């Protein structure tokens, strides 16, 4: 076969692999986020009420700030 056909086949396989990889990664992330939703303020308020604390907005904001800060800090 001609060289250009092999190049065309290789490019088509590369494009198909990238598209398939993107689809699989997207589907995995959607499934992961569905099973493990990110924490929001309502979840923190519910958690505080279950622990017997009165969830004030100041406390909720403090917990949200500390959680976002801990996620941004580098792991050692």
From Swiss-Prot:
Topology in the membrane?
Single-pass membrane protein
- Which residue spans traverse the membrane? 4-24
The question of whether Membrane is a record keyword is answered with: yes
Give a single Pfam family match: UPF0154
Question: Could you name the Gene Ontology cellular component terms for this entry?
Answer: plasma membrane
Q: Which family does it belong to?
A: Belongs to the UPF0154 family.
Query: What name has this protein been given in UniProt?
Result: UPF0154 protein Exig_1099
Organism field: Exiguobacterium sibiricum (strain DSM 17290 / CCUG 55495 / CIP 109462 / JCM 13490 / 255-15)
């Amino acid at each position: 076969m001609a060289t250009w056909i092999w190049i065309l086949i290789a490019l088509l396989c590369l494009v198909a692999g990238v598209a398939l990889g993107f689809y699989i990664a997207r589907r995995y992330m959607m499934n992961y986020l569905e099973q493990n939703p990110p924490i929001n303020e309502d979840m923190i308020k519910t958690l505080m009420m279950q622990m017997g604390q009165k969830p004030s907005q100041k406390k909720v904001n403090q917990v949200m700030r500390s959680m976002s800060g801990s996620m941004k800090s580098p792991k050692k």
